[in-house]
Amino acid sequence: WFAPSRRYDFLAPETRYQLDGERSRHAIDPILEVFGESKVTFYLVGEMVGWYPELPEKISSAGHEVGFHCHIHRRLDDAKEIKKDLIASAGWIQKYKVRGYRAPMINTIEEVYPLLAKHNFLYSSSQYAPAGIAVKKGDVWEIPVSTLSLLNTPTEFNAPRYMNLKLVSGGEFPYGSSFTSGLFRKTVYNIIEREFKAGRSPVIFLHPYEIVTPK
């Protein structure tokens, strides 16, 4: 709710909590109501689970999957920092049998996969790649956020593989990103329909503030 720069680890923990202003707590019920019977994955920030421990329980009780995003939101491209985050959130990860991971900013490193395996994760969704791609990384599957190949379909999927000039100039349209769907809503909707008709299941993500605005 309060991280337009996509990171806020430079702020004191109490300041981060004050800035949230319990918006995350008040938003969860309206979000669950929006999705209704449609099932989704909620990738939670561990720090927020500490503030509002009822969040994963509400999500799980509503029949949705609880995933892990990070413990404190910032760029995570260092193995030591990833390990620290996994340990910091280990309690609720184990309690809710969390099996899915999504790196902040959809940007990770290859070293993440053995670390996830040690914490019993089954999959990550931390790269960008064409819909239908799934890559086995040791004991962990990488199920990327979806792109549309406008040129040649890529054949190598090694992290980091995030939304940048290299990805776009290489002919991939990252329609699974909420940034893209916010700018090109009708185009993205049409792409998703085409993917479904072709038998593929797109992976897309949205942030809470893109779904509801808490009062």
Feature annotation, model-predicted:
Residues W1-A159, F184-K215:
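Catalytic alpha-helical scaffold of carbohydrate-active enzymes acting on polysaccharides/glycoconjugates
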